[in-house]
Regions:
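N-terminal amphipathic/basic leader segments beginning at the initiator methionine
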Residues: 1-24
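Mg2+-dependent prenyl diphosphate-binding active-site environment of isoprenoid biosynthetic enzymes
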Residues: 14-15, 24-221
């Protein structure tokens, strides 16, 4: 089972790496340094946990590989943008990410800020180019934008920043992690299903329960 999972995981990661390279602007296209920073942030690193969740649930619902690859790429761009901004001196002030200098160290703070902004925008360009049902497209937009906003990743990061020097309760800590990390993990699960169809109420409840458990497991391991 472990071996078959590893094979599947490597297959998805390889597929996604190619798709991301294709969907990101070329380094040779003006503004070159911005595009270089975007590609630096996204390519050749990371476990691709969120795209794997898109593919796992999407496969269960019979989604096309081409649609899952597009949706998963949008999710990974949102994740990469959040890491760029989180690493900056005004946030967590990290100098290393995935064993290499963070984007603001490599390209400067201003270019890092722009690269993050551009990746967030590019994610929705990618999502808009999925050529299928219009209702599904709107649902996917709602899910991904909600996970990235003030009731998702941004909200979780705001709570994290506000908590510096304070003792958080278990409830506050859970809320921070649920928003900062769990929101995009949950979105990845839901977007996998929405790569194929709109889930039934029963399927929706099951997916949400699974996403909640997966998010908690991720936090424990992380």
């Amino acid at each position: 089972m472990t071996e078959s999972f590893d094979i599947w995981m490597r297959s998805v990661q390889s597929c996604l790496e190619k798709k991301l390279s294709e969907l990101l602007p070329s380094e040779n296209r003006t503004p070159q340094r911005l595009h270089e920073a975007m590609r630096y942030a996204v390519l050749d690193g990371g476990k691709r946990i969120r795209p794997l969740l898109v593919f796992a649930t999407g496969t269960l619902f019979g989604a096309k590989t081409s649609v899952m690859a597009q949706v998963a790429s949008a999710v990974e761009m949102i994740h990469a943008y959040s890491l760029i901004h989180d690493d900056m001196p005004c946030m967590d002030n990290d100098v290393l990410r995935r064993g290499k200098p963070t984007v603001h160290v490599q390209f400067g703070e201003a270019m890092a800020l722009l690269a993050g902004d551009a990746l967030q925008a590019q994610a929705f360009v990618v999502l808009s180019n999925v050529n299928d049902d219009a209702v599904l497209a709107v649902k996917r937009y709602q899910i991904l934008s909600g996970a990235a906003g003030s009731l998702g990743m941004c909200g979780g990061q705001a709570i994290d920043l506000d908590s510096i020097g304070k003792q958080l309760t278990i409830g506050q800590l859970e809320q921070m992690h649920r928003l900062k990390t769990g929101a995009l993990l949950k979105a990845s699960v839901m977007l996998g299903a929405l790569s194929a169809k709109i889930p039934s109420p029963e399927e929706n409840r099951a997916l949400e329960e699974y996403a909640k458990a997966a998010g908690l497991a991720f936090q424990v391991i992380d």
